[in-house]
Amino acid sequence: MKTIYESLIWKEVRITGHAAAQHIPLKYGEAGTTGTRATLIAGTHGDEGPWSALAIKMLCQHSVAKLTGRLRVIFTANALAAEVERRNSWIDSPNPVDLDSVFPGNKDGSHTDRLAGFIAPLISDSDVVIDLHGGGTWCVNAFVKRFEGSEQLAADLGAPFISNAPNKPGGLTTYARSLGIKVANVEVGGRSSKEMYWTERNAKGLERALFTPGILALDAPPAPAEKAIDVSATVAMRAKVGGIFVPTLREDTVGTIVPTGTEMGKILDLHTLAELQVFTAPYEQTAMMLMRPQICTIEGSALVYLIAKPA
């Protein structure tokens, strides 16, 4: 059996990079010749990519005979950011640029502007675009962003929580949606002891997302996704002061609801370990959408949790 992955035809474009390398490749694989096209993108932010890329590769272990549409995969959209496990590329001048804010890009701009300019045509000829973010090197997430007109796509992805996507100027999915493309933004997974659980769950979600529009034919329809909990606008909880962050709730809690007053974690003084800040769940039902699951040193103002109320 030849798999979709084994059938991918790899292509690349070369983008001006740092002095030692001169050019950085953007590689993408394509399979299928006719029908509805889905483009799956991982690593728009360099600290989020590996888990999402693995989920896409898991999807691609299906037999190529099951591919009834066309598939394009970009496993690492932002290579210079990925190699240092940072959100953005380190060579933009004079300031770092968020790739997910500059679409459709500028081929005469900074490195990231140019990168967006080369990715944009790989989006514009698609019927479905799924931008997989996830948690990353420092957090774990459990939600998908839903766009008007693409509600079923978001539901099929099977995240514990669904939030309405903001209209983010320059965003990859915002750009795709402006072209009439079905889109979803996945924020599921990240570094934790459960990273493979979330990776496999994302792969199952991608199966459903490609089965519904007829891109992937399976011997039997995939199991329906568990109904996600709709949540209201998300709220960021940040560190009021820098120090040592010690989580009370660990990775098993992301994607669940905890009651008001639940201790979530605390910040200790870097020098004396005195308790400086305690995070507690503020709502009667507090949806845990993003969290730091590990002990770490953080700066004041650092994002620690993303929470919401069930809608």
Which residues fall in each region the model found?
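Structured catalytic-domain cores with a bias toward divalent-metal coordination
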Residues: 1-311
